[in-house]
Amino acid sequence: MDGVRLTEIVEKMNLKNLTPGVDITERKVHVPDVNRPALQLTGFFDHFDLNRVQIIGNVECAYLETLTRERKDEIYEKLLAHKVPCIVFSNDLQPESEFIETAEKNDIPVLGTCKKTSSFMGELIRWLNVKLAPCISIHGVLVDVYGVGVLIMGESGIGKSEAALELIKRGHRLVTDDVVEI
């Protein structure tokens, strides 16, 4: 798969779009990993993976509260200049209006969730791992034989379905016939 649309993530994870002025319809997430940008909020951007969804929780917000207005604006500019897929505020945290303005200026979607940071991260990572998993289609028959998946493959017309039918008659289970997605 070439990515998961951000609109699908927003719908599946029940996220609020805090930047309605930013178009999220064509934006995609291509990696199942996420990042909490704590180090980036201090100004350290070495090895920053900008392909990941960025999640800001209580710790990051508490750190931002200690900064002066000028330093916050500088950090917002640096963080949001990177073209990350989106930034999610967890724990029902509300970003400052300056953060939203800078995000809209840089065309970065800012989303919100009421879920706890760790719970949201785990749920999102698990879901993205499934959605972004590689998948191939094979012509054949998949049968469950004593709890083990058996894939019967071969040229068209050689009796794959008939072999599966004989296994089914003996109490085994058909999983899929004709096209098997792995």
Report each predicted region and the residues it spans:
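P-loop NTPase nucleotide-binding/switch module
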Residues: 127-147
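Structural motif
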Residues: 52-55, 85-88, 108-111, 149-151, ...
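Gly/Thr-rich phosphate-binding loop signature of adenosyl cofactor/nucleotide-binding cores
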Residues: 1-79
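Hydrophobic/aromatic ligand-binding patch that stacks against planar heteroaromatic rings
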Residues: 78, 102, 166-167
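Glycine-rich phosphate-binding P-loop
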Residues: 147-175
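Charged, amphipathic alpha-helical linker segments immediately N-terminal to NTP-binding catalytic cores
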Residues: 83-86, 92-127
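Fold-independent oxyanion-binding glycine-rich loops
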Residues: 57-59, 91-92, 114, 146-148, ...
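Walker A/P-loop NTP-binding active-site region of P-loop NTPases
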Residues: 175-182
